[in-house]
């Protein structure tokens, strides 16, 4: 049973290795997510602009322009001219995620992940069992749909409903439609389907999952002979299907699926230290 603050699937790991060792990746993710939000909110709330803009397009310290490659792709489909600074910013972000793993955005940056993790914690804590099965390929169809919507409307239509943008605006400007969309995602994950948004529906995750297929940094089950089938890694992982080939297969111990979010949950929760961060060069 997964817990958001203290994870019961990690109790054995914590008992054997200590609490901090069994939660270090979880703590690092939360620190990164909060720091990312704080960097964007420092300007509107404190008058000191660390990041100006939003998660789609921003400027760091007034010098470095950064752009979400997914947003830039939509703008191209919408027929907008692509400015050189935006292209450079998108290339920088794209290369970064190509190195560390596309869906690291989902686990270490995206603030909506905090919302969906909280919903998942409440599901387990309250014993909610309803889990409508959703096809993981739905997010790929939604990704295609956002590109078609951009082409048909001449706008980045996705930004009108993007929960990440809505959450950021809600934190800065207060109550509004944005919070309604974030609440809808929360209720969907809580009452309808386990990890419905992040694992099945989010087109942003689908895009970065495609990038993640080629990333250098991977989780490795390099000590898989020590696995005692306790299941802690599967109960912690938001994409448990990615673990089986690496843990139980005969080939590479690397988790190679683009669906892996490189969150380190399996590393934290395993009492036998089966998993570790690695790379394609050194499995």
From Swiss-Prot:
Keywords: 4Fe-4S, Electron transport, Iron, Iron-sulfur, Metal-binding, Plasmid, Repeat, Transport. Residues 217-248, 251-280 form the 4Fe-4S ferredoxin-type domain. One of its GO terms (cellular component) is plasma membrane. The keyword Oxidoreductase does not apply. Transmembrane segments: none annotated. SUPFAM superfamilies: 4Fe-4S ferredoxins. Pathway: One-carbon metabolism; methylamine degradation. GO terms for molecular function: 4 iron, 4 sulfur cluster binding; metal ion binding. NCBIfam families: napH (TIGR02163), PRK09477.1 (NF007013). PANTHER family: FERREDOXIN-TYPE PROTEIN NAPH. This is Methylamine utilization ferredoxin-type protein MauN. The lineage of its organism: Bacteria, Pseudomonadati, Pseudomonadota, Alphaproteobacteria, Rhodobacterales.
